[in-house]
Amino acid sequence: ELVLEGEMVEAMRAGQFLHLRVPDDAHLLRRPISISSIDKAKKQCRLIYRIEGAGTAIFSTLSQGDTLDVMGPQGNGFDLSDLDDQSQVLLVGGGIGVPPLLEVAKELHARGVKLVTVLGFANKDAVILEKELAQYGQVFVTTDDGSYGIKGNVSVVINDLDSQFDAVYSCGAPGMMKYINQRFYDHPRA
């Protein structure tokens, strides 16, 4: 987890990401990391990432007050503009695709939107942000191996939901996204 502070926070939207330069000369490529929460009053954003190699491992060694070269915000983010307290929204996240949904949930909950969140992980050790997301609505957790929550992937839960959703927002692995695209193919806000 990183908490960044700066003027660019004012331009951030839920669902966007930042390109972070690894603070050493051996790593030339920037790392794209999703924004998990935004606090415009404090000009701070929180990034939750998984250590995948030497570059992200270096991020984990940073201390408060260290500076980073950051490009962003990048991406379009999610359009939440017309959702209100009469709306019901489905959030679907898988693995490291869960963090960007936290800001979406926070903003929609503040408007009174009813949220149902379905999270998918490989196993119990990979589960993140369940409690934080539960502050904003109902949360279902699936694990591939059944070590926590419901055994299977997000489709096991989604196929049993009988609710009509005004919007569906998702972030995760290509296989999960393919399922969401097929399942909600005709949905105008998926």
Predicted segments — roles?
Residues 1-66:
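Ferredoxin-reductase
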